[in-house]
Amino acid sequence: MKSIIFMGTPEFSAPILQSLIDEPNYDVIGVVTQPDRKVGRKHVLTPSPVKKVAVKNDIKVYQPEKLSGSAELTELIALNADLIVTAAFGQFLPMSLINSVKIGAVNVHASLLPKYRGGAPVHYAIMNGDKETGVTIIYMVKKMDAGEMLATAKIPITDQDDVGTMFEKLSLLGRDLLLDTLPQLIEGNVQPVKQDEEQVSFSPNISPEEEEIDINLPARLVDAKVRGLRPFPVAYFMMEGKRTKIWKTKVIDQTTDLKPGQVVSKTKHELLVATGEHGVISIEELQPAGKQKMTITDYLNGVGENLHPGKQIIDNDKSK
């Protein structure tokens, strides 16, 4: 039986941890996750999904605000584990910890490396309109997501997928790929492959500025941006001067000569807006500032009489 330290935080990581716990050949001797965070309007202190799995299975949990230089780091090194497995942990691992394990430290990364190194690979794959993504298992090294690749698996991105659905799919894909790869790694039957540095791209954590949708983009990429930021952090337009979160859009198979951001047509249940490259989108769910998420029908009930074809309702000036 091989001993494992598992490190992860969000929902993506939880099924991967559970699979290692369920495997009789592995002994998860410690779980490292981010500290409990205040969540929601009531700021309820909430454990991470990974912590919930660990506690349920009576596994010791470590939650350093910063692992490097912490007392927890010293204790983890002293565990003398066979393996470290990380999956969306959210912190850099000190080399002293990586070098302390007997077999190796591996990371389950939610992209087809070397594409999309960094903290938001799923968001960027969808926002950029990619047709596929996947999971790569790599050795942990000092440089972020730059280790040699041990295994990869691909999965399509559909026009209906968002970050939530892709995280679910990629979590299970990563779980299965890890369970296939670890026995080969333990037996020494894996041939690591270096990443092609010329093909590297990055997916940094989403900044507040990145959340605004550029209506000058083609309709396909406007919709991809909405899905690529749903269910978090949620994209927005500046609609008639107010920040309005956009939860759901649909690409319409028609063209228009109206300027991006202008109303193409409006009914009681539909609002079509012009995008870049003569495209058209339907806004289907949105959330005006200070209000709850609502359907376009409910929104139009309140403001519909003020909207007419040709009216500029979305700011299309991205130069500010």
Swiss-Prot record:
CDD domains: FMT_core_Met-tRNA-FMT_N, Met_tRNA_FMT_C. Pfam families: Formyl_trans_C, Formyl_trans_N. Its EC number is 2.1.2.9. It catalyses: L-methionyl-tRNA(fMet) + (6R)-10-formyltetrahydrofolate = N-formyl-L-methionyl-tRNA(fMet) + (6S)-5,6,7,8-tetrahydrofolate + H(+). SUPFAM superfamilies: FMT C-terminal domain-like (SSF50486), Formyltransferase (SSF53328). It comes from the Bacteria. It is an enzyme of class 2 (transferase). One of its GO terms (molecular function) is methionyl-tRNA formyltransferase activity. InterPro entries: Fmt, Formyl_trans_C, Formyl_trans_C_sf, Formyl_transf_N, Formyl_transf_N_sf, Formyl_transferase-like_C_sf, GART_AS, Met-tRNA-FMT_C. Keywords: Protein biosynthesis, Transferase. Disulfide bonds: none annotated. (6S)-5,6,7,8-tetrahydrofolate binds at residues 111-114. The keyword Protein biosynthesis applies. One of its GO terms (cellular component) is cytosol. Attaches a formyl group to the free amino group of methionyl-tRNA(fMet). The formyl group appears to play a dual role in the initiator identity of N-formylmethionyl-tRNA by promoting its recognition by IF2 and preventing the misappropriation of this tRNA by the elongation apparatus. Belongs to the Fmt family. This is Methionyl-tRNA formyltransferase. It comes from Pediococcus pentosaceus (strain ATCC 25745 / CCUG 21536 / LMG 10740 / 183-1w). The lineage of its organism: Bacteria, Bacillati, Bacillota, Bacilli, Lactobacillales.
